[in-house]
């Protein structure tokens, strides 16, 4: 698979402390109790599998068999961006994909953290020409030196753009990312019900002042529509 799971130790959900309770508070037992479960010691290490969520566009062969990956769409998360716990793993996998001739589309909706590629202007650092959200499309064909990287930036009051993704033999597919986002949000009723337009999205302080004003205006219109 193009994305290899990362193994990690699970974080504790509960912290156990020690209370100074006199031993006389507990009834005495003359014999040690028998354990209710007995396993190998290695079972004490809880190792989980973590995978990156992504969408793969694959070739379909002439006999209707699913072929190799042509394009890979990745929704960036805090863990695979700069300074994240999965940054090294993700950088390795993206390099592997690009060297393999796979078109890579990266959706970065995290305005409060720098872009994954240092050549892209950074919104949180106040770089000129930076946008709070970006979609980058890297086509490494015929090779990385001759391939192209295209970055589509958009603001807080602009619809997510429609982008043409190159496939094989000159074929392209136009993907309307705004429609995908809206339909996904609407289909996840738990999220739509939790949307509180009386509150500004967080972290609101990481937006530029002019963008905070635009967000407040959009929120006000949404509040008037839903109330």
Annotated model-derived regions:
Residues 1-227:
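Gly/Pro/Ser/Thr-rich low-complexity, intrinsically disordered segments predominantly at protein N-termini
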């Amino acid at each position: 698979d193009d994305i290899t799971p990362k193994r990690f130790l699970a974080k504790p959900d509960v912290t156990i402390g020690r209370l100074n309770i006199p031993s006389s508070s507990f009834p005495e037992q003359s014999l040690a109790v028998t354990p209710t479960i007995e396993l190998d010691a290695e079972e004490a290490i809880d190792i989980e599998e973590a995978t990156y969520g992504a969408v793969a566009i694959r070739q379909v062969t002439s006999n209707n068999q699913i072929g190799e990956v042509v394009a890979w769409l990745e929704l960036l998360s805090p863990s695979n961006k700069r300074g994240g716990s999965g940054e090294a793993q993700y950088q390795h996998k993206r390099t592997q994909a690009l060297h393999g001739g796979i078109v890579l589309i990266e959706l970065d909706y995290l305005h409060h953290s720098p872009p994954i590629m240092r050549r892209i202007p950074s919104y949180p650092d106040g770089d000129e020409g930076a946008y709070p959200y970006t979609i980058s499309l890297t086509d490494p064909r015929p090779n990385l030196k001759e391939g192209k990287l295209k970055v589509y930036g958009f603001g807080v009051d602009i619809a997510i753009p429609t982008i043409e993704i190159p496939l094989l033999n000159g074929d392209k597919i136009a993907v309307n990312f705004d429609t995908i986002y809206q339909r996904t949000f609407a289909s996840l009723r738990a999220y739509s019900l939790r949307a509180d337009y009386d509150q500004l999205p967080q972290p609101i302080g990481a937006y530029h002042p002019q963008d905070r004003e635009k967000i407040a205006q959009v929120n006000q219109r949404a509040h008037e529509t839903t109330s």
